[in-house]
Amino acid sequence: MEWFFDTFLFCGQLRELRQRTATLARIQLGDAVLDVGCGTGTLAMDVARRVGRAGRVAGIDPGTEQIARARKKAAWRHAPIEFQIGVIEQLPFPDQTFDVVLSTLMMHHLPASLKRQGLAEIDRVLKPGGRLVIADFTRKQERTGQAARFHAGGSSMQDLAALVSDAGFDHLETEEMRPPRFSAFPGAGFVCAYKS
């Protein structure tokens, strides 16, 4: 199912988005990385290869089915990834646990109040100088019907960057990933920042 989703749904754009997310995060061997809204764990699998055996990868998602699939994928690949059910506004980890926190295509599901709570939690679990990379859909103004309801909490990259800045993060950068012409992919953007 993930293969179909990655390969055909958006003409491989999701794979490119995940790769760019990991690259922007400057993940290194031995890093501890948290994937917030990990879904079925595809990004976490790539991150596990990047951090090596000396690193740590954890993923949380509120979906029980997604976490079950992620655990199966990790077991099949013998990847030591900790997947658990959880929500961004109440991360089940001690303070200053992670070098990097990633979130891909998840923030658009949340209202602004939960985004703020979630960013405060990310700040709490990141080590000083830790890196945050958020990738999410852009161009919410063009969505209509069911897509508009699905992306009800969507925001522009500038709005998301402002929330990240308000949460106390430094050295903010944004980047846009334009969809190919005639693609169903709505376009995405990245917000990268560091914990003070």
Question: Where are each of the predicted segments found?
Answer:
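Short glycine-dipeptide loop
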Residues: R53-A54, L126-R131
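A short SAM/SAH-binding and catalytic strip from SAM-dependent methyltransferases
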Residues: V100-S113
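A short glycine-rich, Lys/Arg-flanked "PGG" loop and its adjoining helix->strand segment in the class I
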Residues: R116-P128
